[in-house]
Curated annotation (Swiss-Prot):
Gene name of this polypeptide: Uba3
Recorded metabolic or biological pathway in which this protein acts: Protein modification; protein neddylation
UniProt-recorded name of the protein: Nedd8-activating enzyme E1 catalytic subunit
Keywords: ATP-binding, Ligase, Nucleotide-binding, Ubl conjugation pathway
Family annotation (PANTHER family): NEDD8-ACTIVATING ENZYME E1 CATALYTIC SUBUNIT, UBIQUITIN-ACTIVATING ENZYME E1
Amino acid sequence: MSVHSPNPGLILQSKRFNGLRNILEREGPFCKDGFAASSENLEFLQTKCQVLIIGAGGLGCELLKDLALMGFGNLHVIDMDTIELSNLNRQFLFRRTDIGASKAECAARFINARVPTCRVTPHFKKIQDFDESFYQQFHLVVCGLDSIVARRWINGMLLSMLRYEEDGTIDTSSIVPMIDGGTEGFKGNARVILPGFTACIECTLDLFPPQVNYPLCTIANTPRLPEHCIEYVKIIQWEKQNPFGVPLDGDDPQHIGWIYERALERSNEFNITGVTYRLVQGVVKHIIPAVASTNAAIAAACALEVFKLATSCYDSMANYLNFNDLDGIYTYTYEAEKSENCLACSNTPQPLPIEDPNTTTLEDVIKLLCDSPRFQLKSPALTTVMKDGKRRTLYMSGVKSIEEATRKNLTQSLGELGLHDGQQLTVTDATSPSAMTLQLKYQSNEVEMV
């Protein structure tokens, strides 16, 4: 009588989640109040819980791997980028043969082939390509982004999905928690955001450093830094000479070499030192230093918070983790507080202080909205309701015909435009899927209305 040996693959698969069963099927002294130990908890993770991962780069690859191996059976991943050679040292779900292909699709294909208990659905699109109904299907959203604009946009989307009871309280069933991770070199952070209850991205916007932009007049006429020389060659000389007949490719050594040589010539002309091949690569590609071990640590922290929120087995982090392993290991967790004046989650018009409406032009207001650490907008469009009840578009750059029609308003003062103290402006911008309301607050009482 022959005896068939058991399938080692099936045995391994049945034992894979024994560690999770120890957590989810029995209670302990650190369990969250109200946690019910049951086999249904693991079943929920494997069959019902849907998690959206935004970004399939260094953090995203780690998050996909972690969540797939933690029992999550239904993952979606969004990424609009394609794979570059420079990604391969840390984005381990990709191979050299994947260069030029979609990050989301390659990452999903790798996980689906390697982890049979998990199904990953890829979306090779921008997050802005999806509407509210798409995001409502998920129990949690976890972000591994390198863009502040994208963070602010998804933050605004999750806030716009909140529903309110008749007494003004939030319907908790409409909350989709967001777990956000970020890294730069040996530093990183992870945070838990419960929209409407905890501090959101906008509440702590001043924690993000403003993006460095070099004025065109400076890089063209009075360069002082090696970065100015590189930007000049990249923006002006490349466009004018088009040396290779194709768009600039930051991964092409010929392109980088050409920019390096021209930037070196310009730096010598203005007696500027410090132009190196590596610096040219960093400026051209906007490289943020990335260390694989930092990505792994932050992704693990994020994945743990996803697990705790999905199963309610332990209290989630409250709510911001700092991580630094530059000199040893340093971590610190604190509770970021909601801002009463938050542009996104306060639900009240926010004051926009104006020193003198007779000298402050609309262009000054737009510059304030773009440069202020509080706002950090990209290309705001402004509309308002005038005294006669008619809605008026003050300025909108996104539509050519409207931009041309409203361009003359830029040089007019707020008084000349007929905007009074306390008037509300509706502002839309690429940083948010929904409009924000600002209320003009004049410091000067005398306004000359034209």
